[in-house]
Amino acid sequence: MKCPNCGNETSFQAKKCQNCNCDVTDYKKLVGRSNGLYNDALYKAKIRDLSGAIVSLKSSLQLNKYNTNARNLLGLVYYEMGDTVRALGEWVLSKNFQEEDNNADYYMKLLQNNPSKLNHVNSVIKKYNYGLAQAKSGNYDVALLQLKKVVSAQPNFVAAQQLLALLYMQQGDNEKAAKCLRKAQKIDINNTTTLRYLAELGLNPSAVRVDREIAKRNNTKNKQ
């Protein structure tokens, strides 16, 4: 772990920093809690509770900003939700805190060494931002057209699926809105915005979770 006073690498077993002699007893407790929250987030991410994972990871980083495992996972969660810009932001910060032996290098290179992927990301973000601006201005038809392009290009962009659903709801096309929300929920199962919109449509927010459990049981039976 890093000393909170001088930033020097210090043994987790030590009571004082070997470099500046700062007492790190209390700080070790914070680091331990930070790691616990990271493990909680890792579990939530595995069951696709990405929103819950984000909450745990942000709390983890508040306790220990040097927790690069937590920051890298936060970037991966954002990336899984289609928010590549935020993902890159977290990996850049992670690299600043830990220059050597950092998985953030690998994640960033996957994007930076693929110009077509970066161009795709930039195009999607521009369309989303334009669609969002048009929706706020009341130009719903234009916004709808832009958001349809966004989710077609990047189906896992949760925020875009939610906004498109909201636009469909505004038009009274609840069936299409529900389809967008179910797609968003399959990516992030407990997203509060998605659950709220589903409730407004009078739909069961647990349906995706139930479908997933049934699929797991069927797969188990088939293997037997």
Model-derived features: positions:
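Helix-start (N-cap) detector for alpha-helical repeat units in TPR-like alpha-solenoids
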Residues: 34-35, 68-69, 102-103, 124, ...
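Conserved structural position within tetratricopeptide repeats
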Residues: 25, 61-62, 93-96, 151-152, ...
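Short Cys/His-rich micro-motifs in 6-15 aa windows
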Residues: 21-30
